[in-house]
Amino acid sequence: ECCHRQLLCCLRFV
């Protein structure tokens, strides 16, 4: 998952 590798991606993923 994006969140797993990049925190920024996590913000967009949520």
Swiss-Prot record:
The keyword NAD does not apply. Negative results: 5-10 uM of the toxin does not have activity on 30 different class A receptors of GPCR, voltage-gated sodium channels (Nav1.2, 1.3, 1.4, 1.5, 1.6, 1.8 and the insect channel BgNaV1), voltage-gated potassium channels (Kv1.1, 1.2, 1.3, 1.4 1.5, 1.6, Kv2.1, hERG and the insect channel Shaker IR), muscular and neuronal nicotinic acetylcholine receptors (4 subtypes) and neurotransmitter transporters (3 subfamilies). Keywords: Amidation, Disulfide bond, G-protein coupled receptor impairing toxin, Secreted, Toxin. Belongs to the conotoxin T superfamily. It comes from Conus consors (Singed cone). The cysteine framework is V (CC-CC). Contains 2 disulfide bonds that can be either 'C1-C3, C2-C4' or 'C1-C4, C2-C3', since these disulfide connectivities have been observed for conotoxins with cysteine framework V (for examples, see AC P0DQQ7 and AC P81755). The modification Valine amide is found at residue 14. GO terms for molecular function: toxin activity. It comes from the Eukaryota. Its main location: secreted. It is found in: Secreted. GO terms for cellular component: extracellular region. This is Tau-conotoxin CnVA. Expressed by the venom duct. Signal peptide: none annotated. Interacts selectively with the G-coupled somatostatin sst3 receptor (SSTR3). It displays antagonist property for SSTR3 (Ki=1.5 uM). Other somatostatin receptors are also affected, but with a lower selectivity: SSTR5 (Ki=80.2 uM), SSTR1 (Ki=169 uM), SSTR2 (KI=159 uM), SSTR4 (Ki>100 uM).
